[in-house]
């Protein structure tokens, strides 16, 4: 039986963890190094760090944070946000990240995925996809620039393209569900998990252990990502894992 992963996500802005709803209304949620250490102790399977500061200063802060976290973390972690070229990937991996996540830059220039996969291997490259239902075209469209810009890409078409170029994993966020805590978008998750042969991390909407269970049993995801429910201690990783075991889902 495949082992499912529980992954806390740290959205980092100006050196602090923040959380919003549908990518808006950001509130402070703590210190990234302290939170990372706590999640490591709680037996999280991995961590995802997303740098949502758009400035050059944000890049430097994030490199510092990654180095500090890497010094204390035993579990794998992925870093994304502002990774626009091979040199950005090198910097984050040198700082201690295990994987890098690419989003906007990869949609604008898909060769970035190929370059990263050729240089570091597919296991290091995560394609992060922000998707939202589009009524006009009756499909899920890919968004870039922190969810501000709609693209022409339909979500499964872009997921397949990213994987064909060497992405070893997909981090799929439902923009409609993000921060709402009403459950993952299983329709979207299942569409993508069935379209690609690589692991898919479901993101956006986790409000309870049951929601995370459903990401596996209904959405068919390989991993479930959550932020605010862990940051604000509404539940713990141990409680979520105990719930999974009770319902027959294999977790570490």
Swiss-Prot record:
Subcellular location: Cytoplasm
HAMAP family: HisF
Enzyme class: lyase
Classification of source organism: Bacteria, Bacillati, Bacillota, Bacilli, Bacillales
InterPro entries: Aldolase_TIM, His_biosynth, HisF, IGPS_HisA/HisF, RibuloseP-bd_barrel
Source organism of this protein record: Bacillus velezensis (strain DSM 23117 / BGSC 10A6 / LMG 26770 / FZB42) (Bacillus amyloliquefaciens subsp. plantarum)
Protein name as catalogued: Imidazole glycerol phosphate synthase subunit HisF
Active site: 11, 130
Assembly information from the UniProt record: Heterodimer of HisH and HisF.
Catalytic activity: 5-[(5-phospho-1-deoxy-D-ribulos-1-ylimino)methylamino]-1-(5-phospho-beta-D-ribosyl)imidazole-4-carboxamide + L-glutamine = D-erythro-1-(imidazol-4-yl)glycerol 3-phosphate + 5-amino-1-(5-phospho-beta-D-ribosyl)imidazole-4-carboxamide + L-glutamate + H(+)
Superkingdom to which the source organism belongs: Bacteria
């Amino acid at each position: 039986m495949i082992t499912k992963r529980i992954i806390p996500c740290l959205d980092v802005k100006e050196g602090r963890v923040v959380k919003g709803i549908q990518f808006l209304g950001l509130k402070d949620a703590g210190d990234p190094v302290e939170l990372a250490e706590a999640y490591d102790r709680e037996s999280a399977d991995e961590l995802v760090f997303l740098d949502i500061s758009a400035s050059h200063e944000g890049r430097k802060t994030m490199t510092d944070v990654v180095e500090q976290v890497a010094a204390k973390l035993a579990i794998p972690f992925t870093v994304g946000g502002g990774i626009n070229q091979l040199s950005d990937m090198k910097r984050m991996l040198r700082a201690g990240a295990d994987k890098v996540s690419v989003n906007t830059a990869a949609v604008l220039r898909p060769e970035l995925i190929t370059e990263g996969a050729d240089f570091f291997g597919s296991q290091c490259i995560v394609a992060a996809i922000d998707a939202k239902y589009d009524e006009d075209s009756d499909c899920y469209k890919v968004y870039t620039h922190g969810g501000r810009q709609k693209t022409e890409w339909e979500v499964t078409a872009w997921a397949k393209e990213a994987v064909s170029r060497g992405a070893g994993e997909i981090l799929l966020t439902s923009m409609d569900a993000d921060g709402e805590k009403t459950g993952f978008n299983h329709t979207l998750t299942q569409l993508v998990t069935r379209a690609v042969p690589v692991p898919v991390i479901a993101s956006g909407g986790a409000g309870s252990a049951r929601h995370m269970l459903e990401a596996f049993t209904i959405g068919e995801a390989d991993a479930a990502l959550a932020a605010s429910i862990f940051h604000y201690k509404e539940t713990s990783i141990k409680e979520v894992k105990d719930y999974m075991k009770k319902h027959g889902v294999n977790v570490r």
